[in-house]
Amino acid sequence: MGFTDKGRRGYSRTRRDLLSGASVLALAPHTWFDFSDLSTLFQDADGTTAVAADADPIGKVLDKSGNAHHLTQGTEGARPAYKTGIQGNRAAALGDGGDHLDTAAFTEIAQPNTIFLVARNPAYSGTEVYFDGIASDKRHAAFDYTDQINWFAGSSWGGGVVATESTLYEVVFNGANSPLFENGVGISSGDAGAQALTGITLFGNFEGGGNLSGYIMEFLLFNSALSVANRELVRSYLNEKWKVY
């Protein structure tokens, strides 16, 4: 990372700017959910009651990209919980195996798309989905299955370990050449398929199954194959913030 505090004013500005997320916002993310940012979290789907304390339900999450791709859940019993002090002394959302959050449909975006995910699945069992689309033929998905994380956008391939410890994943959905990075290290590349994307589900699949019993800290989607330098910028922001590795 290269951030060592030696008392220089320049260091403080650099680290503060990185953690502000301003440099990430300048890359024009398509969709951005941050479960440590209380200003974006509400207990109800209408966004009238703010999340304020540990174990509060999360019924709405504002999209920090500015594109208004907000997540909602209208069913009280299917809302993940806000949990404090989970990773890097920051809060995360916890799914109990029966929760999920969904965006409304947005304008279809074709591949390539770059997705960053910070998550933890400490009690992995069977098939558990971190994220998915909202329609059967317009999906980008990540799910734990057969002791590895799998990626799907029409075809499925496995690469990377299950996040029993907090993990920073980044994947470029780019058809037959879809590379995966885990905690900054290139793991593998495979064929994820060529489907476009029209919406996002977190903590489960688009049909309401495969629900995650674990944590999601942050999710970022870019409608492009980010350059190496820009992926490093986003990765640095996420790791400096969440202290994953």
What is each stretch, according to the model?
Residues 156-157, 196-221, 226:
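Extracellular glycan-interaction patches encoded by glycine-rich segments
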